[in-house]
Amino acid sequence: MNTQAPIKLIDGKAAAARVLAEVAEDVRALKAAGIVPALAVVLVGDDPASQVYVRNKVLRAEECGIRSLEFKLPADTAEARLQALIAELNADASVHGILVQLPLPAHIDEQRVLQAVTPLKDVDGFHAENVGGLSQGREVLTPCTPAGCLRLLQDSCGDLTGKHAVVIGRSNIVGKPMAALLLKAHCSVTVVHSKSANLKTLCRQADIVVAAVGRPRLVDADWLKPGAVVIDVGINRIDENGRSRLVGDVDFDSALPQVSAITPVPGGVGPMTIAYLMKNTLVAARLQQTAPSNLTQRAEAACPSIS
């Protein structure tokens, strides 16, 4: 008799739909109180992939009842002009979230621009104040992909207390904030990266593996202990048998017999990223109702006038 528990495919599309439904319900409640959450999306240049990403974000916002504003600037826009636009959006009380679509043209300092967004409107969670707050376990706007990953884990595993989690990758966008969120959820966390020794050995000790390194099929069954839960953040385009396809950082077919739950690529983490952008916009709108004067002070400090 086969007593092995059935493998659980973690459906990111279904989970994202639940998050978006929750957001839409809360947005309706805010609107009933006279508050219309609004997200401003800034796109510099005409990169086709960025245009698709922006359109998807605007569509999800509209579905949730969030007002969306698009600002499209030419690729040769001076950084001072972009900074001036951000300053205007920071000061506009009707705008609750600001997202600057990355990547930016090479002549613009990406970090300087991201730090110009006032922390209470930083729905990407990239501002240093939000990054620091997350590391301290405070309630702040959190990067969308790690927040979505945590929700997938909680929905799949329940209470994460005491679980050993290994995060593969140490990027500012996923790896580091993911580790902070797992610590906040009372996991024991190990972060491994390209310079780590004994990668496979460390990963095989983990109850939870989050792979976020951008290397196609790096992690296979040999990296995973039986019954592990795997969140695959990687999205890599490869050519295989004459066809282009998307694969994750985890070798899905190899890992499948070894794990108790795993996200597919595509259809796993990706939908949750946009869902949590909408959730962050909702949270930002709420935060700004409780700290409007604080918001004004932060906006002035973050975005001084540009002469």
Swiss-Prot record:
UniProt lists the gene as: folD3
Concerning PANTHER family, the annotation shows: C-1-TETRAHYDROFOLATE SYNTHASE, CYTOPLASMIC, C-1-TETRAHYDROFOLATE SYNTHASE, CYTOPLASMIC-RELATED
The record's subunit annotation is: Homodimer.
Q: In which pathway does it act?
A: One-carbon metabolism; tetrahydrofolate interconversion
Write the Enzyme Commission number(s) for this entry: 1.5.1.5, 3.5.4.9
What are the GO MF terms of this UniProt record? methenyltetrahydrofolate cyclohydrolase activity; methylenetetrahydrofolate dehydrogenase (NADP+) activity
Quick one: a GO cellular component term? Answer: cytosol
Q: What does this protein do?
A: Catalyzes the oxidation of 5,10-methylenetetrahydrofolate to 5,10-methenyltetrahydrofolate and then the hydrolysis of 5,10-methenyltetrahydrofolate to 10-formyltetrahydrofolate.
Q: Which family does it belong to?
A: Belongs to the tetrahydrofolate dehydrogenase/cyclohydrolase family.
InterPro entries xref list: Aminoacid_DH-like_N_sf, NAD(P)-bd_dom_sf, THF_DH/CycHdrlase, THF_DH/CycHdrlase_cat_dom, THF_DH/CycHdrlase_CS, THF_DH/CycHdrlase_NAD-bd_dom
Q: Where is the signal peptide?
A: none
Residues that hold NADP(+) according to the record: 169-171, 194, 235
Catalysis: reaction(s): (6R)-5,10-methylene-5,6,7,8-tetrahydrofolate + NADP(+) = (6R)-5,10-methenyltetrahydrofolate + NADPH; (6R)-5,10-methenyltetrahydrofolate + H2O = (6R)-10-formyltetrahydrofolate + H(+)
Q: Which CDD domains match?
A: NAD_bind_m-THF_DH_Cyclohyd
Q: List the protein's name.
A: Bifunctional protein FolD 3
| Alphabetically ordered keywords of this record | Amino-acid biosynthesis, Histidine biosynthesis, Hydrolase, Methionine biosynthesis, Multifunctional enzyme, NADP, One-carbon metabolism, Oxidoreductase, Purine biosynthesis
Which NCBIfam families would you find in this protein's record? PRK10792.1, PRK14186.1, PRK14188.1, PRK14194.1
